[in-house]
Curated annotation (Swiss-Prot):
This is Homologous-pairing protein 2. Keywords: DNA recombination, Meiosis, Nucleus. The keyword Flavoprotein does not apply. Its main location: nucleus.
Length: 216
């Protein structure tokens, strides 16, 4: 038995085509080009007729169109957008672009923090940082004691050059301590960011501070 031939729908154009294209966009609520619309409607509306219908619908404010490269893409406006003025639509696009820019900044910041964390992980472990801090604390304490004795004249006087060198060494050690201390706390906050009680871990590890700090 011969297979029945498929009856092709008669191509349409004009207002009938515009109505069909609009109903299709409204129903699917997705962005399409003229080529997509023509193909999805089984060529009942040709590509050229679809393009003309889409442009007409855009000009009347029923749909929104935007050029991407060499191809225009159209999407049906929702009820609240259909009533929007060109100025309001422009403001919406501006806000969307600002949000995209903010997302880009956050992504860049996230990558930078990941690199910093990786660098910290590759340099010193928490135990090594603690040991370094203790060593620097001891060095500063000894240097401070010697410097205080020199300033009070309780030991044999030394030359001005030697005093300046001692002050320079002290400042260098103090700066090194501050830098390592900051690096340690940065690492601490990165590691404990997801913990509910960082202070409990701090006490368990036996860390000490010179004064009150925010461990959370």
């Amino acid at each position: 038995m011969a297979k029945a031939k498929e009856v092709k729908a008669k191509p349409i154009k004009g207002e009938e085509a515009e109505k069909l294209v609009y109903e299709y966009l409204r129903k699917t609520n997705r962005p399409y080009s003229a080529t997509d619309v023509s193909a999805n409607l089984k060529n009942v509306v040709s590509k050229q007729v679809a393009q003309k219908a889409l442009e007409q619908l855009r000009d009347t404010g029923l749909i929104h169109g935007k050029l991407y490269g060499k191809q225009s893409v159209f999407v049906c406006l929702q009820d609240d957008l259909a009533a929007a003025t060109p100025e309001e639509l422009a403001e919406m696009e501006k806000q969307i672009q600002e949000l995209k820019d903010e997302v880009s900044v956050v992504k860049t910041l996230y990558k930078e923090k990941c690199i910093e964390l990786q660098a910290l992980n590759n340099s010193l472990s928490p135990a090594e940082i603690r040991e370094k801090i203790q060593s620097i604390d001891k060095e500063i304490e000894e240097t401070s004691s010697k410097l205080e004795s020199l300033r009070n004249g309780t030991v044999k006087q030394i030359s001005k050059e030697a005093m300046q060198k001692t002050d320079k060494n002290y400042d260098f050690a103090k700066k090194g301590f501050s830098n390592r201390k900051k690096m340690f706390y940065d690492l601490w906050h990165l590691i404990t960011d997801s913990l509910e009680n960082p202070k409990q871990l701090w006490e368990k590890l036996g860390f000490e501070t010179e004064g009150p700090i925010d461990l959370n």
